[in-house]
């Protein structure tokens, strides 16, 4: 895994806790199978090249302000409030699916619209709906776990077609929801770290 932050303090904190992570600030190597771009990134002057780019939090504005290469699969992960900020308001639960599809088509991105029933939508209209999520996933930081899981699964599975990409995103969302449910069995309320630490159990359960 490679990591970059404009903050030296943040970089130091990450490297102290995760010594296997490579700091781009030190290596200068921007090559990767997938990139996750998060908070504080709209000011980026150079967007790293990768087959898959996941935009989370304030970086989702890049979906409408940056011209990505056509062969890139761009994924955004908004909740309803963020969808509204991007210009796609949802005024009623019945509007979630049509708005997700409109967002995907208009921005030419894959959308993971988070919520009670998370919607995965592709630019060509393909979509799926996941119901594994639980209310506790509204806890701060759990969306970051989903974004990281999504990027890592895209990098690992290397889906090519729209159908394969939607399927991969669906697996990420389902695993995230199942991990939260496992974490809740141990304690409640749960934290984002609880969800992260429960993920290995999801992938080892039969």
Regions found by a protein language model. Give the residues of each.
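Charged C-terminal helix
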Residues: 17, 177-206
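Short, small-residue alpha-helix embedded
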Residues: 139-178
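Glycine-rich phosphate/pyrophosphate-binding beta-alpha loops
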Residues: 134-137
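Short, charged, surface-exposed loops that flank catalytic or proteolytic processing sites
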Residues: 90-98, 158-170, 187-190
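Alpha-helical scaffold segments in soluble metabolic enzymes
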Residues: 13, 49, 85, 102, ...
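Short, conserved aromatic-histidine micro-motifs
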Residues: 5-18, 164-183
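Glycine-rich phosphate/dinucleotide-binding loop and adjoining beta-alpha-beta core of small-molecule
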Residues: 2-132
């Amino acid at each position: 895994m490679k990591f970059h932050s404009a903050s030296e303090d943040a970089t130091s904190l990450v490297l102290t806790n995760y010594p296997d992570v490579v700091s781009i600030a030190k290596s200068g190597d921007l090559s990767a199978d997938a990139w996750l771009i998060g908070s504080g990134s709209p000011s980026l002057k150079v967007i790293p090249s990768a087959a898959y780019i996941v935009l989370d939090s304030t970086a989702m504005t890049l979906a409408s302000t940056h011209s990505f290469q056509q062969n890139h699969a761009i994924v955004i992960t908004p909740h309803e409030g963020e969808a509204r900020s991007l210009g796609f308001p949802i005024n009623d639960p019945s509007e979630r699916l049509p708005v997700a599809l409109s967002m995907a088509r208009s921005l030419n991105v894959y959308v993971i619209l988070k919520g009670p029933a998370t919607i995965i939508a592709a630019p060509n209209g393909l979509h799926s709906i996941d119901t594994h999520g639980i209310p506790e996933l509204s806890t701060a930081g759990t969306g970051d776990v989903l974004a990281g899981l999504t990027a890592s699964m895209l990098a690992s599975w290397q889906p090519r077609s729209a159908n394969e990409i939607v399927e991969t995103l669906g697996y990420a969302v389902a695993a995230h929801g199942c991990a939260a449910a496992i974490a809740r069995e141990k304690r409640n309320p749960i934290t984002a770290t609880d969800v992260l630490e429960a993920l290995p159990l999801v992938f080892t359960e039969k």
